[in-house]
Regions:
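Ser/Thr/Asn(+Pro)-rich, low-complexity disordered segments
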Residues: 1-231
Length: 231
């Protein structure tokens, strides 16, 4: 783990045999939470507390739509580390200062997602209290289309996020489902609504990984639908 610091305090984004260390580092709150926990727990080459503090010093605490939380735009950032650790009641120095924990932070991030969809600042089709889920996902692009008098640029795979974007109207139902532990009171109604409003999204493999109602598709009243699934 100390090797992965590449001479710095925060972890390198990665290493390739052909080119060596990547130029970027794991800084700012993200799915790297589990990475730093693993590094701190190593019995032989552990990261130091100084390294962890250097990472948390890059955090951004924001108030969005009335919710104060540790900011991360894409929803997956608030979900992946929780697959392995139940963070309820676990606080580091940063979260103690905020009187919160990472589980509560993910709950607030889920509500921010819903509120963004309700406000729908960019005017995408279908966004609302029961249609949200903006995260890293496949998209219908790269393409530019004129939709209801507005020129819109659509992306392919991209880490989409709220409230600062990027956002091109692409939604991921799996991201909603993955928020079930944090906010079941808004997740379950959303999944139920999507099951009725978008029955074409589900097949024998489950839900498709993403869809975009705003992207015009000839012969379809539902817009773009990904052909991929997440297992």
């Amino acid at each position: 783990w100390r090797w992965a610091l590449n001479g710095g305090l925060t972890l390198s984004h990665g290493w390739k045999p052909e080119t060596g260390f990547l130029r970027y580092r794991w800084e700012g709150y993200s799915e790297a939470l589990i990475l730093y926990v693993l590094g701190l727990g190593s019995p032989t080459h552990a990261l130091s507390a100084r390294s962890y503090d250097a990472w948390t010093s890059t955090y951004r605490w924001k108030k969005v739509y009335g919710h104060e939380f540790l900011y991360g735009g894409p929803l997956f950032m608030h979900q992946l580390s929780h697959i392995w650790i139940d963070f309820r009641g676990i606080q580091d120095a940063y979260m103690r200062r905020q009187s919160s924990d990472y589980f509560e932070n993910s709950r607030r991030a889920t509500y921010v997602q819903q509120q963004y969809a309700i406000r729908n600042p960019k005017g995408f089709r279908d966004y609302g209290a029961h249609v949200w889920g903006i995260t890293a996902s496949n998209g219908p692009g790269p393409a530019t289309r004129r939709v209801r008098g507005v020129t819109r640029r659509f992306r392919a795979y991209l880490a989409r996020g709220v409230p600062h974007g990027p956002d091109d109207g692409t939604l991921a139902p799996w991201a909603v489902a993955a928020s079930l532990p944090f906010a079941p009171e808004i997740v379950l109604p959303t999944l139920e609504h999507c099951g009725h409003a978008y029955p074409h999204m589900e097949n024998e493999y489950g839900l498709v990984c993403s869809f975009n109602p705003t992207f015009p598709v000839p012969g379809s009243k539902h817009g773009w639908l990904s052909k991929d699934h997440f297992a």
